[in-house]
């Protein structure tokens, strides 16, 4: 027997609808009806989180001190390596459990975990090559978030096939061992393929990885830092996205994560191929990466929490819009001709692009996963704008993932114990 939900408004693929009844069966939306009164809350489709490194949740607030030299992404990376070398499998599960709980409480209902912390601290493989991935899957199962595992191929420390550095020893794989890792991840649930970057995979390896992915999601970091752009130019004579578009079969199943430093021609090329721009505005601001040129991009985009320094879907959207306002010296930059309400345009765009990047159905529609979020409000555009631009705390009330309620009145049932276990882990690690 289908379960039914009635809302005063719901954000459907075609826009807002009033007095909406959803029928849910076996984790999917069986029917969407309008004109059914009696609902009180506003329903939003669950937000996909298209880029996360769950273990980095343990770094939040611990890299905000200036060192003796100029601080940058690259100095932050050295601190991240120290954490990565200390993490044990149980620590990965603890960090991921808290991160996934916080994602759900903020309205993320699915996450693409860009996972590269594969091996033991000395670089040897665990008996189960997917031990760390299995911990991520366990955390997702226990919290209820929908997980796309993206095991990362990381074989080199720089362009031209440079050998990995000693502190990167937990990340490395050959194509053969990576294929075994992918097979293990596929047994754990939905999975894709993730070359770390053009620095970490040669063209021959990237070609093999694209073949391995087939039509599954393929995600790659690209053009996050100007130093990467300069190194790619020195190596190939081309910019990173330009190089990818010329040498790889970039298509709709590709997500180009960050793509911060791109030209209008590269932006047009990404859009023409159907690649999703994976934007992580809070992390990109935290690391001083730069600002994605959204005004030059006509393609799909989604949002990710990346380093998990602050996990909040609405604040990612806020940072995205405000960064564009600062760059363009205009207001309401991400609004569109068809959706002039900025928060609604941001939300709808990120849901659509994020769902494509994760290879899942997105939106409140028949056949889609029954993953949705409720907020309070009478006028839905204003309610969503307040949640994105004016809320001091998340305005999410309840969250369902595949028909299961995982957040009630803004709180996940595991929130308290997840935080206590996380704090105890930090006391050991830091």
What positions do the PLM features span?
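His/Asp/Glu-enriched, well-ordered alpha-helical/loop segment
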Residues: 246-249, 253, 294-376
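Active-site microenvironment of metallo-dependent hydrolases
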Residues: 1-20, 25, 344-430
